[in-house]
């Protein structure tokens, strides 16, 4: 469903106010008629969604429409396809069907997130915790300083934010199930 993708906010304000029936938070900048604009740039780098250009076509996942660049009507039930780590070269007609990639065991982003989480849980300073995460957001052009945010004052607030950042940054890297188990 939508819940993992609601973590991709650009303004820092959560998209939803509630948990049962989502109530849109006006401060988030979310627009139901254009749900992919003004979002964390990592969303577009992670998933393909309706209307996005990819390869030699436009993704169209609407019911009864062509939903992939090859024109097959095998729509994804979620409305999303994985984009992260999928090179567009595989759409080339001359492509052999193989694409070998080295598996990344650990990324610097994970090290920063692990450090921020450990620092937060150990009662580290607010500035140190948030400054550990800042390079991840700077890298994608979200340069608003986390230390300027007023909603990350408590350890619990920062814990939730770090968990959201892990969901976004480490999407499709086999961390989510282990993170959820560790957090519960």
What are these regions, as identified by a protein language model?
Residues 1-184:
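Acidic/polar-rich alpha-helix caps and helix-coil junctions
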